[in-house]
A protein has these predicted regions:
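Active-site cores that bind ATP or allylic diphosphates and position pyrophosphate for catalysis
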Residues: 208-210
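A structural signal for short, hydrophobic/glycine-enriched beta-strand patches
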Residues: 26-177
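A transmembrane-helix-recognition feature enriched in membrane-embedded lipid enzymes
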Residues: 172-199
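N-terminal membrane-anchoring alpha-helices
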Residues: 1-43, 199-205
Length: 210
């Protein structure tokens, strides 16, 4: 019994240390990420969705990302923009469509991916539009960039440039804690998604990434 208790305590403290280390890392890259790098060039800009309410009103993170992607498109960073983000409820407008409208990017150069509900699904569905060999410019807030990069790499993207829409949305410090948990949660979901490839249909496996 004592051995089991020691094992449980060891696992508990290992988990605590891992979470604290992850949190410190998230804070570090959020506030140290350079915002003034030269703009990259690519085949497509990927605008990753954030929050949207049932009425179709974009949250501050989505607004930041949409406006940044519009600016990048007008600067000639890429010829098309893929807006990626699903619907808050059936029948509601997608985050992707609302962000495309907010960005000012013309319909002819905007691509709407309106199915995704997670960063992993952003990657999976966006790459079905662009292909895995396209040169992609990922746009999101600085705190979210590393997980976005890892998600797109995991889904097969080869050439990725990262551009922050800003460090953090206004009053968004709670997002740092959420991102800490999301990193580990995403890793677990991705492992489960890969492990079930041999015996689950694709639609069910896709739901695992929700």
């Amino acid at each position: 019994m004592r051995r089991l208790i020691r094992l449980c305590l060891r696992m508990f403290w290992t988990g605590v240390i891992a979470l604290l280390a992850t949190y410190a890392t998230v804070i570090g890259w959020t506030y140290l990420w350079p915002l003034d790098r030269p703009l990259p060039r690519g085949d497509a800009i990927i605008c990753l969705g954030a929050s949207i309410d049932d009425r179709g009103q974009l949250g501050p993170g989505s607004v930041m990302r949409a406006e940044r992607c519009g600016d990048l498109w007008r600067a000639g960073v890429a010829p098309v923009v893929v807006f990626s983000g699903g619907v808050p409820r059936p029948g509601a407008p997608s985050a992707a469509a609302a962000m495309a409208d907010r960005s000012g990017v013309p319909e002819a150069t905007a691509r709407i991916e309106g199915q995704s509900h997670s960063t992993l699904q952003n990657a999976l569905f966006s790459l079905r539009i662009t292909g895995t060999d396209a040169r992609l410019v990922l746009v999101t807030e600085a705190f979210h960039l590393p997980r976005s990069w890892a998600s797109f790499r995991a889904m097969g993207a080869h050439d990725l440039a990262l551009v922050p829409a800003g460090r953090l949305r206004p009053d968004g410090r709670a997002m740092l804690l959420r991102e800490t948990a999301a990193i580990w949660f995403n890793a677990g979901r991705y492992i489960l998604w890969r492990m079930t490839a041999a015996f689950l249909p694709d639609d069910i496996r896709t739901d695992l990434l929700h």
